[in-house]
């Protein structure tokens, strides 16, 4: 009787393309930015995100904004109204710009995208919209071969259609792609197209997993 050691078991072939989320993956966690907005409004740090999940007006506005049916100002008005209902003090106009101000880049993750693209692996941004200033800190053309932003294509994650669009624009079969996202339900949606998923928590965890999935060296020269 023979046995196969874990190190000799067949591995998945390397993925041919990378799909990557923006907020919470290439930036600090969204909870941090929304927490700062909540505190500035005189509320508990968890309030703004809770309202987006539970307040009918704010939740509906977010969904409409993400698919491009509600502009920045309309979303700002809805979220500001929800914040005011629970006793917060916030100026609606410029709310999204202030939120973007708190959305600092996670530089090691941004550098990973540069590394992957420099290695010849096509990279697509697949992101749900969050205001016109959301991507102001990065050069999208430098980092990505393709950008698929929900408000521009009329469909949002976790719908399979947004991932189909990204794969079609890259010219790569979905089964040859890997997606990095900080939200589990977005990964579940992509998995329905056989897109592999990496649940992002920290750069230290994600970077070696992305390199391994793409068949890239697991370490880089200092």
Q: How would you name each of these model-derived features?
A:
Residues 2-20, 114, 130-222:
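Asp-based, Mg2+/Mn2+-dependent phosphohydrolase catalytic module
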Residues 3, 8-110, 118, 130, ...:
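N-terminal helical cap/lid subdomain that shapes the substrate entry/recognition surface
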Residues 69-70, 121, 152, 171:
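Residue-level recognition of short, well-ordered coil/turn positions
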Residues 113-116, 122:
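Conserved, well-ordered alpha-helix/loop/beta-strand core segments that scaffold catalytic motifs
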Residues 119-120, 143:
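Structured helix-beta-strand junction loops
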Residues 120-121, 195:
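A generic structural motif
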Residues 127:
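Conserved phosphate-coupling serine/threonine residues in phosphotransfer and NTP-handling enzymes
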């Amino acid at each position: 009787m023979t046995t196969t050691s874990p190190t000799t078991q067949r591995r998945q072939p390397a993925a041919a393309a990378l799909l990557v989320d923006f907020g919470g993956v290439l930036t600090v966690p969204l909870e941090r930015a929304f927490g700062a907005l909540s505190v500035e409004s005189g509320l508990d740090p968890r309030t703004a995100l809770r309202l987006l999940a539970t307040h009918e007006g704010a939740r509906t506005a977010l969904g409409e904004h993400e698919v491009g049916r509600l502009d920045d100002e309309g979303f700002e008005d809805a979220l500001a109204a929800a914040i005011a209902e629970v006793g917060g003090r916030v100026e609606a106009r410029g709310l999204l710009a202030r939120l973007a101000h708190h959305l600092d880049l996670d530089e090691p993750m941004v550098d990973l995208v540069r590394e992957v693209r420099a290695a010849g692996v096509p990279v697509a941004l697949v992101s749900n919209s969050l205001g016109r200033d959301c991507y102001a800190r990065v050069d999208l053309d430098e980092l990505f071969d393709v950008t698929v932003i929900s408000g521009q294509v009329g469909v949002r994650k976790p719908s399979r259609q947004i991932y189909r669009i990204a794969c079609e624009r890259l010219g790569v079969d979905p089964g040859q792609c890997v997606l990095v996202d900080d939200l589990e339900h977005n990964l579940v949606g992509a998995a329905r197209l056989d897109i592999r998923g990496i649940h992002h928590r920290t750069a230290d965890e994600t970077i070696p997993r992305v390199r391994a999935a793409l068949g890239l060296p697991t370490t880089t020269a200092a």
